[in-house]
Amino acid sequence: MVFCLTTAAACSPVQQSAGISEPWSVTRDTIEARRLFEENIDAIHKRDRARYLATYLQTSTLARNGPSGLELGYENWSARNSSQWPDTLIATNLRVVPISAGVVYGTYCYSVTQKDTTSSGVSERVFVKTPMGWRIAVTTAFGLPPGTPRQCK
């Protein structure tokens, strides 16, 4: 009887935990999302609007958040037509964390100078794998109050 239970248990299919990918998939997702993250920041550095916009999900569900609140949609996004770029952008502590298969969270600390004004804060991205490759589905930027020392970790 013990033998039958052991055999039955050994032959029973094991269900994977929801939201957890195989290690190779998590690693690949993380590497690919980080590559897109770096592409996004590099496009800002090079003021390459086409490359910058190509990193984003171009749908009505693109989420952009900051101190003024959540805004949705690609079509009404001011970045599509703006000619403003920061004079300098220093991005540090770039980190990515796999959430589930095809979804990766990313964050970085920033210091940006534009027109003799420097501010710093934290920016976040949520990367999703699409049939067209990896895209940014959520982007945020939260600046520190003026005069506050950098505190990002």
Regions found by a protein language model. Name each.
Residues 23-31, 44, 53, 71, ...:
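Post-signal/leader-peptide non-cytosolic segments of secretory proteins
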Residues 56, 62-65, 103-113, 126:
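Short, well-ordered beta-strand segments in beta-rich or mixed alpha/beta enzyme
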Residues 40, 52-53, 60, 77, ...:
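Hydrophobic pocket/interface hotspot
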Residues 1-8:
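Bacterial N-terminal signal peptides
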Residues 75-120:
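Surface-exposed, charged secondary-structure patches
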Residues 55-71, 82-85:
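A short gly/proline-enriched turn/hairpin at secondary-structure junctions
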Residues 12-18, 120-153:
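Short beta-strand edge/turn micro-motifs at domain boundaries
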Residues 11-55, 147-153:
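Short, low-complexity N-terminal intrinsically disordered segments enriched in polar/charged residues
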